[in-house]
């Protein structure tokens, strides 16, 4: 479930960022390019999440 939610958020946020950048540069918004960027970002986030070490010793305050 976390993979699906992560993909949805990555998809939405990357599309909003691409729309904003395209709007600021006075160029047309391209859905296909934004989708490719979203998939690449999703893969990078998932790879980094698996590579990064988890803190197994949770401190209790």
UniProtKB/Swiss-Prot annotation:
The entry's keywords: Cell membrane, Membrane, Transmembrane, Transmembrane helix
Gene Ontology, cellular component aspect: plasma membrane
Stored InterPro entries: DUF2929 (IPR021324)
Record localization: Cell membrane
Main location: membrane
Topological relation to the membrane, as annotated: Multi-pass membrane protein
Domain of life the protein comes from: Bacteria
Pfam family, one: DUF2929
TM stretches of this protein: 4-24, 34-54
Protein name (Swiss-Prot/TrEMBL): Uncharacterized membrane protein YjzD
The organism's taxonomic lineage, starting at the top: Bacteria, Bacillati, Bacillota, Bacilli, Bacillales
């Amino acid at each position: 479930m976390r993979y699906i939610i992560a993909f949805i958020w990555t998809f939405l946020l990357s599309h909003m960022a691409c729309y904003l950048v395209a709007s600021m540069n006075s160029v047309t918004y391209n859905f296909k390019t934004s989708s490719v960027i979203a998939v690449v970002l999703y893969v990078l986030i998932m790879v980094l999440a698996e590579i990064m070490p988890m803190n197994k010793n949770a401190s209790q305050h």
